[in-house]
Amino acid sequence: MSEATQTEKKQAQKERKAYRAKKRKLFFKTLFSRKIVLVSAIVVLLIILIAIFADFLMPYNPNQISIPERNQGMSAAHWLGTDEYGRDLFSRVIAGSRVSLIVGLLAVIIACVIGTTLGMIAGYFGGVVDDIINRTSEAVRVIPQIVFAISLCAVFGGGILNLAIVLGISNTTVYIRMMRSQVLSIKERDYIMAGKLQGNSNFRLMFHHILPNSISPIIVTMTQQVGNTILSEAGLSFLGLGISKPTATWGALVNG
């Protein structure tokens, strides 16, 4: 009996490794075949590089006020001109990239953690749990994202962390739907059934077996969502619901 159990365990491990290798291969194939994913990744990478080296790229302090130089046009001294307070717009655009990136990454991480966990629970347990999570997700999804985000901003207020939480919560449904479909396609596979027979807990099966085999679509979704979240942050800042002045953000710069 012990030998049979060991054989089943080894077979289950082989199946897991083979499935993960297949998913990795499919992930890279999908990544390089979808132009929108590549474009999203390149844009995010460019923003990351600008944000990292912002201190070296900014010719002026983005918050430095110079009344004699206000409302100037583009010139050799000020590539994008200056605003009504004489602040260099090129420096503020670069500084805004750092703020937007921080908000975007935090929001995507929050959305991914909450949405992936709820989607995995819904798909794995099914029944009433699935109905509650799925129906709640659908109810949130029918509300326009910007309207939902504005409502949450009224509750949480401004600030980088609060804005990231607001955008993270509003994007949670994307991960719930994606992860639920992944779990439904994985949980009946042989190595999951073998794990149940070996006495593995539901927690271990979900986070040690199902989640690692779903990482590829999660990464693709996160890559796409970073860009979308940055645009949402810009929209909220444009409406005056984002980060308070004088902190430079892209939306606030567009708003003037």
What are these regions (language model features)?
Residues 152-155, 182-183, 231-256:
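Glycine-rich helix-loop "coupling/hinge" segments at transmembrane-helix boundaries
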Residues 26-30, 88-95, 131-141, 152, ...:
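Short amphipathic alpha-helical coupling elements at transmembrane boundaries
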Residues 87-102, 106, 126-134, 188, ...:
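Amphipathic cytosolic juxtamembrane alpha-helices at the membrane-cytosol interface
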Residues 39-43, 103-107, 133-136, 149, ...:
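Hydrophobic core positions of alpha-helical segments in small-molecule transporters
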Residues 79, 89, 110-115, 120-124, ...:
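Generic hydrophobic transmembrane alpha-helix motif, especially the helices
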Residues 128, 139, 191, 235-237:
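Helical "lid/switch" subdomain of P-loop NTPase nucleotide-binding domains
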Residues 1-116, 127-128, 142, 146, ...:
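Gly/Trp-centered helix-boundary motif
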